[in-house]
């Protein structure tokens, strides 16, 4: 019986990067069937593999039709691995659904994750979260990226412990093996470059770097520059760049535009440090990429980040820009501290799997012979009782 691999929920971002890394590293063969969006990164990952690919165009109706087609393949014993997202619609009872779950905000209801959205935009995000919660509940097994979120799923939201697994993140082969095939904008050669490798999602709190730049500007400290990877035409990018220009902070920022996974490694090598100021993450590939490429990491001080990074990062408070200024200045001025943080990051990375080990762990779970449909009580019920 073939293994169905459902990547249809993925269109961009870290999830797509992880899926491509899985396809490159996993020992898959013709006994697998991959369903995914029509994306060059997926097609490239499978180009030299004899793995059937069912590529679908973008659009909600194409997705619905494709997922119904996947569900029809089921006989109640067929395993479908969805990475990352809800299982195919209409598949409950037809397929044994194993899902990779990276929707951290669903497990932190105490955080107003969409506080930056108003009106219809906020309503849209709320409806999407409802669908994701409903879809995730219809899975049979759940794979999380961190122990912290897996514990929350079990202890606070009634996920059955014997059906919850953790597969820790690994550095993406696309990033580690990347060589640049595009011309990047010139980066200031005499500045300490801190890379924030992220899109313009409000959760990333990239705007906090403006407050950091203002604090540096007030001190006439021009030794630092933040390297951003934002799509130039995105409304959020235009607003951010307008704020930067309004305050006269252009010398503190360089936006290189969207960077494909296969080009990311070349950019990381050109920078001195990496940062992640997100309010919440399931797990960030920024962590393992910084450690693997021997760059110090600055990250939000929170339970989810400490659970993943241990002593392999400098913890900062984005709402208090002076904490970021102090961290950057120490990294720039104290070579021993810089080297120590790089070494600690490498030590934390040693506790994580390689891309091949991670892929093998996924396969060990989804190829188990004792997988069955879940017939127990509905998950999420504790959340309803607490609200």
Predicted features and spans:
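A conserved mid-protein helix/loop that constitutes part of the nucleotide-sugar donor-binding site
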Residues: 13-24, 192, 201-215, 235-238
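Glycosyltransferase donor-sugar binding loop
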Residues: 35-40, 224-241, 257-258
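Nucleotide-activated donor-binding/catalytic signature segment of Leloir-type glycosyltransferases, i.e.
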Residues: 50-51, 238-259
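Membrane-proximal helix-turn-helix segments that form the acceptor-binding/catalytic region
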Residues: 121-142
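Aromatic "clamp/platform" in nucleotide-sugar-dependent glycosyltransferases that forms part
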Residues: 279
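Short hydrophobic beta-strand element within catalytic cores of glycosyltransferases
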Residues: 296-299
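Conserved acidic donor-binding segment of nucleotide-sugar-dependent glycosyltransferases
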Residues: 314-322, 330-335
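A charged, aromatic-enriched C-terminal amphipathic alpha-helix characteristic of glycosyltransferases
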Residues: 336-381
């Amino acid at each position: 019986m073939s293994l169905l691999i459902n990547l249809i929920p993925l269109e961009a971002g870290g999830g797509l990067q992880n899926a491509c890394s899985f396809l490159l590293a996993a020992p898959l063969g013709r006994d697998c069937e991959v369903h995914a969006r029509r994306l060059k990164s997926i097609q490239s990952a499978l180009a030299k593999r004899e793995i059937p690919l069912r590529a679908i165009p973008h659009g909600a109706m194409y997705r619905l039709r494709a997922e119904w087609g996947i569900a029809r393949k089921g006989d109640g014993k067929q395993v479908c691995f969805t990475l990352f997202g809800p299982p195919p619609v209409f598949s409950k009872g037809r397929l044994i659904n194993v899902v990779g779950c990276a929707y951290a905000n669903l497990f932190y209801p105490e955080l107003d994750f969409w506080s930056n959205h108003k009106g219809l935009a906020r309503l849209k995000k709320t409806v999407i979260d409802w669908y994701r919660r409903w879809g995730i509940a219809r899975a049979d097994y759940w794979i999380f990226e961190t122990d912290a979120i897996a514990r929350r799923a079990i202890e606070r939201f009634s996920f059955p412990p014997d059906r919850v697994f953790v597969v820790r993140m690994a550095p993406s082969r696309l990033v580690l093996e990347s060589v640049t095939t595009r011309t990047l904008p010139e980066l200031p050669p005499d500045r300490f470059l801190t890379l924030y490798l992220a899109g313009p999602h409000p959760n990333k709190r990239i705007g906090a770097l403006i407050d950091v730049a203002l604090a540096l500007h007030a001190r006439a400290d021009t030794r630092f520059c933040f390297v951003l990877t934002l799509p130039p035409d995105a409304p959020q990018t235009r607003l951010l760049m307008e704020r930067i220009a309004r305050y006269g902070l252009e010398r503190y920022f360089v936006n290189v535009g969207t960077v494909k996974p296969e080009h990311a490694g070349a950019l990381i090598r050109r920078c001195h440090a990496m940062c992640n100021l997100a309010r919440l993450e399931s797990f960030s590939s920024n962590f393992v990429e910084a450690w693997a490429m021997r760059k110090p990491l600055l990250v939000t001080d929170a339970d989810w980040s400490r659970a993943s990074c241990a002593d392999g990062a400098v913890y900062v408070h984005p709402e208090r820009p002076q904490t970021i200024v102090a961290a950057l200045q120490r990294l720039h001025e104290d070579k021993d501290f810089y080297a120590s943080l790089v070494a600690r990051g490498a030590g934390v990375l040693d506790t994580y799997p390689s891309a091949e080990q991670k892929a093998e762990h996924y396969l060990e779970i989804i190829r188990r012979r004792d997988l069955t449909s879940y017939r127990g009580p509905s998950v999420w019920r504790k959340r309803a009782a607490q609200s």
